[in-house]
C-alpha cells in the first residue's frame, strides 16, 4: 500500500460496503470518496435493471482510486438478486439433486456469466453450510447436503464455474448457519 495513504483510506481497503438506492447520490459519492472501500455489494434493493446496475457500479468506481470488488450475494433459488433482471436460477439443492458435477460447474458458470454481464466480479457464494435439520428453516434449499464431502464436491465445481466466467467466489457462512 502506498506510504502516502492515510489511515482512513487504508482501513477502507478492508471494507466492502452496501448502501440504499439504485443510483449514485451525492451522499453515496461522498461516502465512497471518503472511505475508499475495497468493494461494494449490491442487493435486490439496488438492482432495477441490467443497464442501471452496470451504470451504478461504474459510477461507484469513479469515486474510488483502486479497482473495486463489485460484489453480489447470488446463489440461485431463494437468494437470487437477478431474478427480475435475467430470470430465476435454480437453487443449489436443486442442482445438487441431479448428482451431475458438470451441472454443478455449469450452475456456477451461468451465475458467473450473469454477474459479469451486469458488472460484478465477485459472488458471495457458494453456501458451505451443512444441511442439518436444525438449520433447515434458515438454509432450506441453500445448503446441498449434511455430508461435508458432498458439500465440497458441489462447492469446488461451482467455484470452477464462477472462475470460468471470470468471477471470484466466496464460500460462506462463517462461523456457519449449519
Predicted regions and their residues:
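Boundary/entry segment of secreted carbohydrate-active catalytic domains
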Residues: 2-23, 158
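Zymogen propeptides
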Residues: 17-20, 26-35, 47-48
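Short, compositionally biased "basic patch" segments
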Residues: 1-7, 172-177
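Phosphate/pyrophosphate-binding betaalpha-module
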Residues: 154, 159-175
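Enzymes and membrane/adaptor proteins characterized by extended Gly/Ser/Thr/Asp/Glu-rich
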Residues: 34-151, 178
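Generic enzyme active-site microenvironment
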Residues: 18, 71-72, 170-171
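Alpha-helical segments flanking ligand/cofactor-binding loops in enzyme cores
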Residues: 30-33, 113, 156, 160
Amino acid at each position: 500500500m502506498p506510504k502516502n495513504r492515510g489511515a482512513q483510506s487504508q482501513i477502507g481497503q478492508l471494507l466492502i460496503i452496501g448502501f440504499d438506492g439504485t443510483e449514485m447520490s451525492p451522499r453515496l459519492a461522498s461516502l465512497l470518496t471518503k472511505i475508499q472501500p475495497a468493494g461494494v455489494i449490491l442487493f435486490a434493493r439496488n438492482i432495477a435493471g441490467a443497464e442501471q446496475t452496470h451504470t451504478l457500479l461504474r459510477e461507484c468506481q469513479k469515486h474510488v482510486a483502486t479497482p473495486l470488488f463489485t460484489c453480489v450475494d447470488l446463489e440461485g433459488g431463494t437468494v437470487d438478486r437477478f431474478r427480475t433482471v435475467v430470470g430465476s436460477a435454480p437453487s443449489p439443492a436443486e442442482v445438487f439433486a441431479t448428482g451431475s458435477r458438470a451441472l454443478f460447474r455449469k450452475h456456477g458458470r451461468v451465475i458467473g456469466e450473469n454477474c459479469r454481464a451486469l458488472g460484478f466480479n465477485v459472488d458471495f457464494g457458494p453456501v458451505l453450510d451443512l444441511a442439518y435439520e436444525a438449520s433447515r428453516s434458515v438454509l432450506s434449499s441453500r445448503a446441498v447436503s449434511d455430508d461435508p464431502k458432498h458439500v465440497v464436491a458441489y462447492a469446488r465445481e461451482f467455484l470452477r464455474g464462477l472462475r470460468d466466467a471470470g468471477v471470484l467466489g466466496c464460500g460462506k457462512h462463517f462461523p456457519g448457519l449449519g
